[in-house]
């Protein structure tokens, strides 16, 4: 099979029955293959155009190589074949909301099968399984969503890291699929059970693995409902583990865990880690392991969560949530945060209210899916410097975005994949594809965790079989 560009997209499902992770081509096909393994839940793949302008780029974890949803690859077409995008291969996976990670021709997918959390390593071109690393998991979602992992695998050199819904953090050797180390952060840091388990993807920074842990002092409440949200912190909002051994190097932040993932940016010549925790946006010095500043940002509702990952542009940071306070842009001067604009206490409608998705920043504008429930969700464009709403497009259900070759790749919960031309003037759709299924099948994802990955123009789609 000729190497071709791969657009990898994962749609998580919650309905009962079988699920298949499918990989399909984002460009006209050359070769179509199918894996013989079509077990209970699955993954499928198709070949792309093999555009000679394309340079293959790994997608080693959540939001891609730069952790901002932007790909370095080129050659994404403006239109797709009238009959849609063909399937290349299909592979069984378990339940969960984890996106795929892709590196050196290997695809890593983390899911739950019965009482086992499973990290699978697949050949990205053929879907053939190379190994599976698993451990027991008894996590049960408090709100009735599925019990699989939420965080995306992180590939770093010879290792891949996972963070399970129950709080198990592990380092797995890519060469043989065996764990180099494994630990339970829930037990080690006394993490009080929260609504949806662990949902933050760790960040590799030099020789450290930075993790959104959010533990509490011993003897605390059994869960957030029992305590009516009054849960103390033990100073482990973010914990730095030695990525080679799992030893704790430092911990900082008097806050609890969120479903947002940390990012790192260079501000005034120094690396700063930004993490939207349960109650605050934190600025952290990763060299000293100290919290520099915090900016309060959380809705008053007990069940509210901070889940969108901060977006950094220059010395400014965008944060958002969907339950009450909406969005804000703050400026960080290496010592403190200063508001640029905020939705909080605005009389007009909020600029953006992001639930699970992280927006794309491009040329001074933000593009993201605003809305709590699928029926009310709409795609929006907002001016970065003012929060001014430029346009909104309803009726798309909740969606996630990537920026590829100057175009937006938009994946919606209902399984619709679109290519959009980014413009602050108006919504402009270049291509649209609804993933086709056979009789007795449906394609949809839930909780707006329609995570995507881009590598060599193959599309990964989850297909549910009733």
Predicted features by range, described:
Residues 1-3:
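N-terminal secretory signal peptides that target proteins for export/translocation
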Residues 5-19:
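Bacterial N-terminal signal peptides
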Residues 18-466:
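Noncatalytic, solvent-exposed loop/strand surfaces
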């Amino acid at each position: 099979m000729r190497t071709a560009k791969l657009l990898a997209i994962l749609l998580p499902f919650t309905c009962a029955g079988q699920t298949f992770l499918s990989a399909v081509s984002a460009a006209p096909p050359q070769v179509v293959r199918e894996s013989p393994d079509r077990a209970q839940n699955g993954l499928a793949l198709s070949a792309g155009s093999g555009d000679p302008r394309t340079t293959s780029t790994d997608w080693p974890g959540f939001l891609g190589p730069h952790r901002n949803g932007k790909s370095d690859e080129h050659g994404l077409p403006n239109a797709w074949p009238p009959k849609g995008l063909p399937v290349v291969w299909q592979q069984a996976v378990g339940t969960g909301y984890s996106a795929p990670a892709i590196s050196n021709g290997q695809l890593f997918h983390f899911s739950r099968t019965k009482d086992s959390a499973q990290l699978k390593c697949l050949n990205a071109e053929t879907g053939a399984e190379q190994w599976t690393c698993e451990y027991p998991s008894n996590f049960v979602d408090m709100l009735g969503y599925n019990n699989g992992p939420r965080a995306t695998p992180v590939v770093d050199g010879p290792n891949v890291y996972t963070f399970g819904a129950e709080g198990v953090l592990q380092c797995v050797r890519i060469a043989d699929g065996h764990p180099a180390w494994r630990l339970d952060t829930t037990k080690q840091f006394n993490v009080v059970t929260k609504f949806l388990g662990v949902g933050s993807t760790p960040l590799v920074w030099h020789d450290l693995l930075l993790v959104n842990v959010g533990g509490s002092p011993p003897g605390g409440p059994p869960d957030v409902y029992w305590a009516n949200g009054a849960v103390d912190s033990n100073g482990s909002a973010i914990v730095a583990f030695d990525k080679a051994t799992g030893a704790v190097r430092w911990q900082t932040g008097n806050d609890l865990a969120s479903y947002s993932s940390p990012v790192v940016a260079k501000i005034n010549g120094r690396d700063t880690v930004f993490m939207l925790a349960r109650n605050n946006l934190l600025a952290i010095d990763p060299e000293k392991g100290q919290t520099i500043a915090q900016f309060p940002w959380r809705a008053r509702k007990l069940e509210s969560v901070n889940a969108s990952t901060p977006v950094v542009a220059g010395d400014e940071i965008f944060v958002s949530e969907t339950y009450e306070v909406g969005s804000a842009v703050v400026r960080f001067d290496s010592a403190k945060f200063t508001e640029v604009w905020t939705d909080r206490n605005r009389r007009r409608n909020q600029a953006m209210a992001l639930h699970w998705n992280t927006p794309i920043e491009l040329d001074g504008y933000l593009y993201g899916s605003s809305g709590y429930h699928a029926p009310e969700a709409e795609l929006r464009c907002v001016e970065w410097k003012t929060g001014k709403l430029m346009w909104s497009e309803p009726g798309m259900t909740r969606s996630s975005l990537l920026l590829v070759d100057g175009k937006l790749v938009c994946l919606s919960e209902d399984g619709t994949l679109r290519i959009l031309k980014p413009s602050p003037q108006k919504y402009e759709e270049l291509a649209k594809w609804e993933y086709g299924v056979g009789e007795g099948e449906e394609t949809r994802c839930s909780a707006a965790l329609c995570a995507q990955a881009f590598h060599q123009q193959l599309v990964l789609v989850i297909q549910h079989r009733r």
